Curated annotation (Swiss-Prot):
Claim: Secreted is one of the keywords in the record: yes
List of catalytic residues: P2
UniProt EC number: 5.3.2.1, 5.3.3.12
GO MF annotations, alphabetized: cytokine activity; dopachrome isomerase activity; phenylpyruvate tautomerase activity
Reactions catalysed according to its record: L-dopachrome = 5,6-dihydroxyindole-2-carboxylate; 3-phenylpyruvate = enol-phenylpyruvate
PANTHER family reported for this sequence: D-DOPACHROME DECARBOXYLASE, MACROPHAGE MIGRATION INHIBITORY FACTOR
The keyword Isomerase is annotated on this UniProt entry: yes
Chief place of localization: secreted
Known function: Tautomerization of the methyl ester of L-dopachrome. Inhibits migration of human peripheral blood mononuclear cells.
Protein name: Macrophage migration inhibitory factor homolog
Location(s), subcellular: Secreted
Gene, per the UniProt record: MIF
Lineage of origin: Eukaryota, Metazoa, Ecdysozoa, Nematoda, Chromadorea
Pfam families: MIF
SUPFAM superfamilies per UniProt: Tautomerase/MIF (SSF55331)
Length: 115
């Protein structure tokens, strides 16, 4: 159930369909999860400042039941920062990505929790 949310000050209409097609491939490959469970949410046009500047920036949260943690977060970050830089043209030094391990009993899908 990986969930990757991106809040950004880039206008919503500047989020390309190429990004929306590529992101659901990058996230599950990074985590080793099936694409059928991946959710990507992009919130464009947010009033945001990063480092005192209104230049394009996102704040991202990656949530997953397992597959995140100290031993793997650097690998995930590398892939996600590359996605953001390549597709949204956002420099790596203008973004935070938070990785959150969700308890299976705290996430529901199709009428029941995962655990």
């Amino acid at each position: 159930m990986p969930y990757f949310t991106i809040d950004t000050n880039k206008p919503q209409d500047s989020i390309s369909s190429a990004f929306l097609k590529k992101a659901p491939n990058v996230v599950p490959k990074a985590l080793g999860k099936p694409e059928s469970y991946v959710s990507i949410h992009v919130n464009g046009g947010q009033p945001m400042v990063f480092g005192g500047s209104e230049d394009p920036c996102p704040v991202c949260v990656l949530k997953s039941i397992g597959c995140v943690g100290p031993k793997v977060n650097n690998s995930h970050a590398e892939k996600l920062y590359k996605l953001l830089a390549d597709e949204l043209k956002i420099p790596k030094n203008r973004c935070y990505i938070e990785s959150v391990d969700i308890e299976a009993s705290s996430m529901a899908f199709n009428g029941s929790t995962f655990g």
